[in-house]
């Protein structure tokens, strides 16, 4: 959408919320305060959008960008709650035509109007706290049929959708790296949408990823946001940091007499940006040993159909953020076959991470961020139920 239509639509949505809520608050000072907050949120929106394209250079610009992004999260809750209120009042009015006096519409309108700012503020503050804290560790056992004994207990740590950019900087990334390094991983998988910005602006903030530790190294695949941010430059930068970037490629890891193929595809939408980089699970697997366990890193869950057809055993994805906050955790299901967790797709397992950071507004509500520790176990052994825990100390693993 072009800037002017986007601004016009945004203005109409803000005006709708202001009209429906402010007019129902029942006190002039409440209405004035609500309109002032709404106006501040609207006026700082351009700074939020600008920060997604280029790093703010001045402290005031950074403050305005933060204000715009927090305000965007607040407004999303205000809009949803206002629509729900109007639907509820409409239903109450219909009931009142059948049962006159059965519904106290005036009281309902007043109380619901006053509840909207309070609920939206609560959700936004709690969502901010959830987004800004370091992701908890989610532990998942993946049952694999005919798993070679040498791969029993193989540990994969997945991080995804960090979105280093306007509000996620080096300290946030350093905390993630420290948490991952305590998990004694065999392999670290970074499943795309690492950045929202150029190498020039963000290289210093991504640099801590070079300190990730595991036995077999760190592997990265592109997400759609890498293509918005200069994918070729980021692939070069990550390789410079010692991170293996898989572009429809694979490597073979050995454990005794067992092998595991670690393959990665470009983002599902990469072909729209560069036809030569179209996502291709079959090509990623070409030339791999046929008897090996096959693991695919694919940013979007909808790669699953092609991945299963190519013969993969397990796909690790992200992209969805689990919806990040209401109501998107319901709407994301319209675009992706899986939104979060371990799911079976025909003969293949798919694990979809809710993401380790966040995108846009610093807000997570109903979809907590995660660092995922996946453990391969034989299918005949009961898998442990997924659990959430803060990172725990573990023996140091040797470097990448």
Regions found by a protein language model. Name each.
Residues 1-135, 382-400:
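Non-catalytic terminal accessory segments
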Residues 138-139, 143-400:
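Soluble catalytic domains of enzymes that build or remodel membrane lipids, polysaccharides, and related
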């Amino acid at each position: 959408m072009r800037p002017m239509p986007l601004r016009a639509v945004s203005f109409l949505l803000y005006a709708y919320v202001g009209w429906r809520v402010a007019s129902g608050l029942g006190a002039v000072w409440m209405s004035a305060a609500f309109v002032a907050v709404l106006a501040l949120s609207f006026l700082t929106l351009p700074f939020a959008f600008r920060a997604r394209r280029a790093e703010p250079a001045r402290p005031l610009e950074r403050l305005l960008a933060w204000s715009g992004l927090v305000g965007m999260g607040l407004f999303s809750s205000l809009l949803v709650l206002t629509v729900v209120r109007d639907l509820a009042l409409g239903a109450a009015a219909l009931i009142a035509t059948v049962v006159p006096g059965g519904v106290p519409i005036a009281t309902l309108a007043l109380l619901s109007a006053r509840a909207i700012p309070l609920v939206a503020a609560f959700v936004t503050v709690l969502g901010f706290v959830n987004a800004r804290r370091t992701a908890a560790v989610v532990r998942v056992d993946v049952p694999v049929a005919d798993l070679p004994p040498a791969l029993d207990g193989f540990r994969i740590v997945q991080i995804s959708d960090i979105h280093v950019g306007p509000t996620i900087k080096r300290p946030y990334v350093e905390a993630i790296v420290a948490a991952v390094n305590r998990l004694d991983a065999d392999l670290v998988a970074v499943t795309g949408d690492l950045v929202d910005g150029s190498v020039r602006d963000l290289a210093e903030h991504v640099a801590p990823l070079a300190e990730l530790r595991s036995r077999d190294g760190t592997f990265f695949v592109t997400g759609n946001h890498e293509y918005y941010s200069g994918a070729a430059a980021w692939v070069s930068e990550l390789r410079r940091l010692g991170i293996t970037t898989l572009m429809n490629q694979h490597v073979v890891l050995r454990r005794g007499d067992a092998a595991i193929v670690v393959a990665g595809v470009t983002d599902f939408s990469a072909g729209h940006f560069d036809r030569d980089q179209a996502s291709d699970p079959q090509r990623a697997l070409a030339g791999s040993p046929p008897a090996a366990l096959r693991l695919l890193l694919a940013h979007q869950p909808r790669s699953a159909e092609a991945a299963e057809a190519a013969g993969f055993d397990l796909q690790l994805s992200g992209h969805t953020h689990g919806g990040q906050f209401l109501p998107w955790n319901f709407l994301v299901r319209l675009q992706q076959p899986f939104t979060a967790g371990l799911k079976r797709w025909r003969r293949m397992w798919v694990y979809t991470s809710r993401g380790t950071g966040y995108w846009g507004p610093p807000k997570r509500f109903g979809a907590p961020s995660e660092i995922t520790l996946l453990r391969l176990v034989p299918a005949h052994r009961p898998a442990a139920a997924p659990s959430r825990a803060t990172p725990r100390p573990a023996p140091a693993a040797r470097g990448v």
